[in-house]
Amino acid sequence: MNREQRRQAERIARRGARSTPQRESERNITHSLVAQALVRNRIMREVHSLRTNASLHAFTGNDASHIADRMGRLLYTVAYATTVHGLHRTPEANILRGTANALSDIAASPAALETQRAAILAGLSAIDRLMPSLHEFSLAAGALELDQILLAGNFTTDHVERMLQQRAAA
């Protein structure tokens, strides 16, 4: 590399290292309304996909472990957002607690699926009623916390009930 090429490379490196307010705002989604809208759209698309998957299996599925997994994921995410918004004392939050108990029963005994199906469907209805009151970023925070719990490898449906009880006691 000759001297001129080296100087040119140094100029390019310095130019790229400079941070302007415009470059910072382009990288930071909190200043970009378009980026925020895209993130919100993606979060809601994933939540609705999880909700659709859970409801299909709840209505027609016979695989108890799959129902418990999908519904448990959705339930925890919504329960987290519910507590963030202070809705943990609503009838819907009580239904979420009951659904968590039903999922716990299903996880322990897959034969209990048919007897607990009504509680799962009630939980889906409660989730539908809660969703308009929940912010997308609260749902995302719940999903991130769920991911941390899953990485630890000890997620049970009792996490939902404990979290709601914790917030109700506070």
Predicted features by range, described:
Residues D69-G98, R129-L146, L150:
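Extended intrinsically disordered, low-complexity coil regions enriched in Ser, Thr, Gly, Ala
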Residues R40, S49-T52, A64-M71, A93-L96, ...:
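Short amphipathic alpha-helical segments that mediate assembly, nucleic-acid/protein binding
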Residues I106-P110:
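Solvent-exposed, conformationally flexible loop/turn segments
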Residues A111-A170:
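Amphipathic alpha-helical binding modules
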Residues M1-R27:
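Short Lys/Arg-rich cationic patches that frequently serve as NLS/NoLS or arginine-rich RNA/DNA-binding motifs
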Residues N2-R6, T52, T60-I67, H88, ...:
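Alpha-helix initiation/capping motif
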Residues T20-V84, R167:
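Short terminal alpha-helical segments
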